[in-house]
């Protein structure tokens, strides 16, 4: 996937170039040239994954120049042991069509 500046859509860069630059040379933000399409089933399946697996599936289409093992390593290093469990942001299903994402700073 390629990225372009919010101030100039003509010059495109790779994800690693966008990450390395931070901001585009013209001061704009880098945005993806397209957004991956997810089906309802894709979205429901994300709720059944642990946080790191969910992060991988969400990031992978945006960072397609990196291999899956590279992405897994980056995710593991980014999140490390900073959370009480692998479910850093657990999803609780209330029924087949309703889920709640738990975001908590303190676990008692």
Which sequence ranges carry the predicted segments?
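N-terminal, positively charged, Ser/Thr/Ala/Gly-biased leader segments
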Residues: 1-65
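Glycine-rich, N-terminal phosphate-binding loop and its surrounding beta-alpha-beta segment
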Residues: 47-103
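Conserved small/polar residues in nucleotide/adenosyl-binding loops
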Residues: 106-108
């Amino acid at each position: 996937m390629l990225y372009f500046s919010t101030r100039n859509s003509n010059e495109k860069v790779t994800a690693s170039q966008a990450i390395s630059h931070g901001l585009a040379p013209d001061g704009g933000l880098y945005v993806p040239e397209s957004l991956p399409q997810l089906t309802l089933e894709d979205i429901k399946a994300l709720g059944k994954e642990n946080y790191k697996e969910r992060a991988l599936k969400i990031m992978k289409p945006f960072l397609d120049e990196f291999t899956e093992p590279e992405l897994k390593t980056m995710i593991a290093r980014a999140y490390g042991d900073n959370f009480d469990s692998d479910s850093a942001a657990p999803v609780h299903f209330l029924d087949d069509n309703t889920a709640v994402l738990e975001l908590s700073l303190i676990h008692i």
